[in-house]
Amino acid sequence: MGKFGRLDAGVQKTVSGRAYAYCSSVTDLTDEHMPPSSWFIDPKPDNMLTVPACRGCNAAFGRDDDEFRLSLGAVVGMDTPETIEFNRTKVMPGVIKNRRQTRQVLGSTRLLMRTASGASTFGEAALFRVDFGLFCRVGQRLARGLYRFETRTSLPADTPVEVGRVGDPAPYLERIFKGAKFREKGPAFAYWHVIVDDLPTHSVWLFDFYSWLFMIAITGGLIGNLPDET
């Protein structure tokens, strides 16, 4: 299954009949794009998803948004017109502006052999590893935000959220997400999710970034039921 991380749970709150995804603020409220709009190439999809959040939370997420965008650009590479455009318009401007972030990403690079369908080698490429703490924070935020979007409620404070990287999504799509609800927002992002009917805080989410980076998030402790990729 690989490495998983658990982060602190968020807080459930309702203000004037609205549940907020991240904090208990009742002032200076806004809608946050989920995922952040800066991870999408232009033209952006119609009807991008939003969840209610305060401006303070939005501002606090800014650094993670920037660092994950840079890391995502390195991970997805430049193998398709969409990933080329993403790197050209969304990643390179940040590389120029923030040399520290660039050094962090390049410092996690190693050479690997890339294979076609897990079989014949067809070349070498650089493998970029996203900082695991950043990876977990992004996954937890996506799970909580999209849970809020799908259910119109927020996960309770004591609900654990675990996050892991998926190399091959096929076992999950076949065994966990077969027939699951699916949403796609252009080439940049798609997700599948299953929420347990009689245990509504228990859910599993599979996030797809540019059909290259796959992330799974589990709320409520379902990790023992996931398929083994090996």
Regions found by a protein language model. Name each.
Residues 66-70, 101, 134-137, 141:
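Exposed alpha-helical structural elements
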Residues 59-95:
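Polybasic, low-complexity binding patches
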Residues 10-13, 44-47, 128, 132:
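Short, charged/polar micro-motifs that form catalytic or ligand-binding hotspots
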Residues 1-19:
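Short, charged surface segments at domain edges that flank catalytic/cofactor-binding sites
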Residues 19-50, 61, 66-67:
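Histidine-centered nuclease catalytic patch
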Residues 90-132:
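Short flanking/linker segments adjacent to small metal-binding domains or redox-active Cys/His motifs
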Residues 120-230:
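C-terminal, charged low-complexity interaction regions
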Residues 54:
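Zinc-coordinating Cys/His ligand positions in small cysteine/histidine-rich zinc-finger domains
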